[in-house]
A protein has these predicted regions:
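Pyridoxal 5′-phosphate
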Residues: 1-251
């Protein structure tokens, strides 16, 4: 389903039903409260059920790729230490290029770990050759739709933090989400994303988890909102309704 070929009918129906309400979830009245509940409950279920998060914040964008650029950019521009960032040759372009782009923008060295040409995966031993005490960020995908490999993100994160306890670990879980459990707490990562349309859901939305320490970094937000709020503008309750339909189906 790497191209989103499987879609849950109930997700489409849920989205269509909510889109029929021409009201705003930020209005203080009955229907507005009902729509706001979809956003509140949907955010909670995505963070807790999909990502396995006990805390942190949710980034919402039109695509998962946008969430990756948003999160990586926030870290790379918000951290004033470190001389390099690491990703791999196996990454989706949005994860790979986000690291490359912000390395150029912040004047840091861009390091790329090669894939294992025999297994098609990424070896933790090889990854650690590229990580040092000056590595700000390490971005490694959870699973590859090209080779079919599932990476041991928990082990990779653990070993990277043995080298540099302050490193930020990012994992693109877009291809992983429909096939295996995501557990950001167990993995000990700071950023993780997925695309609903590749997980039986609808197009036009992408979601990312960010850890507590990333959530409060300076980022684009309204002045009066709390430091850990990433939602910007009127939310789309229908997208949350569609994702909750997927969660109900899968879980």
């Amino acid at each position: 389903n790497s191209g989103g070929s499987l879609r849950l009918k109930r997700a489409v129906e849920a989205k269509a039903a909510i889109e029929e309400f021409p009201d705003c979830p930020e209005r203080a009245r009955g229907r507005g409260f009902d729509l706001a509940d979809y956003v509140k409950n949907g955010t909670k279920e995505i963070l807790e059920v999909i990502f396995g998060a006990k805390s942190g914040a949710l980034i919402t964008e039109l695509t998962a790729s946008q969430t990756m650029f948003h999160a990586v950019g926030t870290i790379m521009e918000g951290v004033d230490w470190g001389k390099n960032a690491v990703t791999s040759a196996l990454e989706h372009p949005s994860a790979h290029d986000a690291v490359e782009y912000y390395c150029k923008k912040t004047g840091r060295e861009f390091r790329e770990v090669p894939a294992n040409k025999v297994t098609g995966g990424l070896d933790p031993d090889e990854i650690m050759k590229y990580v040092d005490k000056d590595t700000v960020l390490l971005s490694i995908m959870a699973a590859s739709n090209i080779s079919g490999n599932i990476m041991d993100i928990k082990e990779i994160a653990r070993r990277a933090k043995e080298i540099n306890p302050d490193i930020y670990v990012v994992s693109d879980a877009v291809q992983h989400a429909p096939h295996a459990v995501i557990d950001v707490e167990d993995w000990d990562v700071d950023v993780c994303n997925f695309a609903p349309y590749k997980f039986f859901g609808v197009r036009g939305c992408g979601y990312a988890y960010v850890s507590d320490r990333v959530a409060v970094m300076p980022h684009i937000k309204l002045t009066c909102k709390d430091d850990n709020v990433w939602a910007l503008g009127t939310p789309a309750p229908a997208n949350f309704a569609a994702m909750m339909a997927v969660i109900d189906y899968v879980c």
